[in-house]
Amino acid sequence: KAIADYKASKYQDDINEINSQIEQIKFYNGFTAVRGPGIMVRVSDNISEDPELDIMERIVHDVDIVVLLNDLKAAGAEAIEVNGKRIINISEVVCAGPLIRVNGEVIPAPFVIIAIGDMDELYDAVTEEGTYAYELKNTYGMEVVAAQGYNLTVREFRGINYETKYAEIVKEGEK
């Protein structure tokens, strides 16, 4: 028993370090829920009854959400979700008729985006004159409402089973 205890304690530091690295990798890749300061942005369709306004100009499109997400990333967002769907490197935001598909699930408007990061930087990225969100609101009449929060939560990624067909891991030393 003493030998087994010795071996277990000898490797415990290595095991703890590996577990710590796994948790860090999960965090950086969106596989853990996170909490912190940031903003919540609600984006929804133009509700104007103006018959002159084309229906395609009255609805929020996938590209609108993609541009908003990119603006938030550029402003330093550390974690983002749209209607509860965590945005990670393999997330897709694509048109699905009057809806959008995120991580393989179809979601309707209104679109609620939560981004964690510097509240002021993120808020400015969606409210200042000249930003895409400002244009959506003031040129196209979309509802774009942003609010800051000190204790927002972005859920962990739960989505599609991503399968690689072409990419292979390059081992260290290989070219």
Q: Model-found features: residue ranges?
A:
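Juxtamembrane "stalk/linker" segments
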Residues: 1-42
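A generic local secondary-structure boundary/capping motif
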Residues: 28-31, 101-103, 142-143
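Residues in well-ordered beta-strands of folded domains
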Residues: 42, 114, 153-155
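Soluble extracytoplasmic domains of inner/organellar membrane proteins
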Residues: 47-134
